[in-house]
């Protein structure tokens, strides 16, 4: 195992009983990330954690390669949890819970083993969650506001919205990634930058326009509209959306 089985993080916070993860997570790929099918409004405790790990890791990185790395990390965690000496409380943890249970050295070793980069940020994230006072990490991930999520090291405008958009059916937000900025320019929206705006005021203004534009495409959810738009642009097609059209025209 990656560390000796000492007191887990929730015990350090004063919780005497673990409600972490309501089921064992077998080696069946159920927690694995598929970047083309990332949306999950009914995620289990374990799945919401793997979705969050991917959201943090993929910022500024290729999605397919990052998904492979995160899935490798999930495999490493599951192997540790299946160790003959692992107690049930370890086996029941979701992936983020397990990583937060580790001390900082074995934690960062697991991150480095999968070459996820941003190691200082990951370590700050580990410290942030270990200082967090909440009954469970899944509860936090399912209920935290965008503003609260943005307090986590490594989670800014795009990451917070990417995670919320694809994990909550009632989300009214969108990450202003490259594909969305191109999408807005192709719709004739003026003054759209080539990169995600650093100004919060500019971000919120463009986000409001993007939300309405994505809704006009006629997909069942905002997350679906975002994902399909990303697929179109990442496949190398240039899209031209005429005002009022319910579906994109590929030219």
Indicate where each model-derived feature is located.
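Alpha-helical ds-nucleic-acid-binding substructure associated with the helix-hairpin-helix region
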Residues: 75-153
